């Protein structure tokens, strides 16, 4: 099933966190927090301003993002648990450090 978010909403797949700490300790599932990083799966067309013009989205499909701990609504699409949230719930886009240094 294809899913297209409306307006300024984005569909996000959570990116799982590490299962070990830097010191080598294994973190049990019960102690893990839900990750606040995700991969943008789909984006809406953008909200409309007062004149009815579309406001372009800052994120695009494939962006790795950081969002608030309680952001979004959990939805199931094709048996996969995803999040749908407004673009304003996204705190930032995570870029590859090597690519950022080259720019």
UniProtKB/Swiss-Prot annotation:
SMART domains, sorted: Cpn10
Localization per Swiss-Prot or TrEMBL: Cytoplasm
Superkingdom of the source species: Bacteria
Annotated InterPro entries: Chaperonin_GroES, Chaperonin_GroES_sf, Chaprnonin_Cpn10_CS, GroES-like_sf
GO biological process: chaperone cofactor-dependent protein refolding
Cellular component aspect of the GO annotation: cytoplasm
Protein keywords: Chaperone, Cytoplasm
UniProt xrefs under Gene3D superfamilies: GroES chaperonin
Molecular function terms, GO-annotated: ATP binding; metal ion binding; protein folding chaperone; protein-folding chaperone binding; unfolded protein binding
Chief site of localization: cytoplasm
Any single Pfam family the record assigns to this protein: Cpn10
Oligomeric and partner information: Heptamer of 7 subunits arranged in a ring. Interacts with the chaperonin GroEL.
Function comment: Together with the chaperonin GroEL, plays an essential role in assisting protein folding. The GroEL-GroES system forms a nano-cage that allows encapsulation of the non-native substrate proteins and provides a physical environment optimized to promote and accelerate protein folding. GroES binds to the apical surface of the GroEL ring, thereby capping the opening of the GroEL channel.
Similarity comment: family membership: Belongs to the GroES chaperonin family.
HAMAP family: CH10
Protein name listed in UniProt: Co-chaperonin GroES
Native source species: Dinoroseobacter shibae (strain DSM 16493 / NCIMB 14021 / DFL 12)
Lineage: Bacteria, Pseudomonadati, Pseudomonadota, Alphaproteobacteria, Rhodobacterales
């Amino acid at each position: 099933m294809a899913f297209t978010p409306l307006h300024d909403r984005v569909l996000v797949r959570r990116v799982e966190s590490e299962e070990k700490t830097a010191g080598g300790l294994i973190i049990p599932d019960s102690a893990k927090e839900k990750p606040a990083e995700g991969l943008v799966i789909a984006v809406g067309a953008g909200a409309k301003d007062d004149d009815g013009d579309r406001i372009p989205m800052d994120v695009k499909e494939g962006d790795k993002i950081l969002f608030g701990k309680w952001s979004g609504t959990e939805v199931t699409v094709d048996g996969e648990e995803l999040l749908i949230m407004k673009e304003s719930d996204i705190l930032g886009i995570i870029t590859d450090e090597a690519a950022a240094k080259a720019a």
